[in-house]
Amino acid sequence: MKLRRAAVAAGLAVAAVAAHAQFVAVNEGFENVAGLPAAGWVLNNASTPIGTTGWFQAGPGFFDAFAGSQFSYIAANFNNAAAGGTIANFLFTPVFTTEGGSTVSFWARSIGEEGFVDHIRVGRTTGGTSAGDFIQIGGDITLTDTWTHYTFGIAKQPVGATGRAVIEYFGVADTSDFVGVDSLTVNVVPEPETWALFGLGLAALGFVKRRRKPA
């Protein structure tokens, strides 16, 4: 009886917490940009005309990372597009559930060299990885020469929905310079089924213990 009461109490506690709990679906420090595709990331440079670079691992000659080892951040620059071109370079996270809503946060900055300006915007997709799939959230961001923290939310989507978070580096190639993105996380509200299964597990535990009691 005591165990059953404990299981019921735990189940009620789970129900109370569920509405506010979030789990980390993506946690990327960009120590190894080359390994991102294998982890579900998509790097899509849709600049026109396309240039000689895309998203790449930072290296010597630029600013240090916000966190982690010295160059553990992902970078992009004016060479994403050819001279006179337009930059549209997309960074898509792995797919995660959007049913319960989610929060995406990261740090970003530019060099801040006089005469140049760097812009990014953030958004989501329903899973696609092309420029046409991009759904912008919030306004355009003009980066500064200081690591700055950005957070944006993805509203609750229909039952079973999944999607990706997106960062787009954009602008005129001739007046753009260099950007870095570091420490990106996606926190999601778990699907109701996750909590239901946990509650069933507690109930099953109480049932098994009750059946094991001696006659």
Language-model features and meaning:
Residues 84-88, 171-187:
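Extracellular carbohydrate recognition
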Residues 129-159:
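Extracellular carbohydrate recognition and processing domains
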Residues 1-8:
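Bacterial N-terminal signal peptides that target proteins for export
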Residues 191-208:
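A short, hydrophobic C-terminal helix/tail in secreted or cell-surface proteins
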Residues 82-100:
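Short beta-strands within extracellular/lumenal beta-sheet-rich domains
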Residues 23-24, 29-78:
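Extracellular glycan-recognition surfaces and repeat-rich motifs
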Residues 99-100, 109-117, 128, 173-175:
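Extended, low-complexity, turn-rich repeat/linker tracts enriched in Gly/Pro/Ser/Thr and Asp/Glu
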Residues 17-21:
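Sec/Tat signal peptide C-region and signal peptidase I cleavage site
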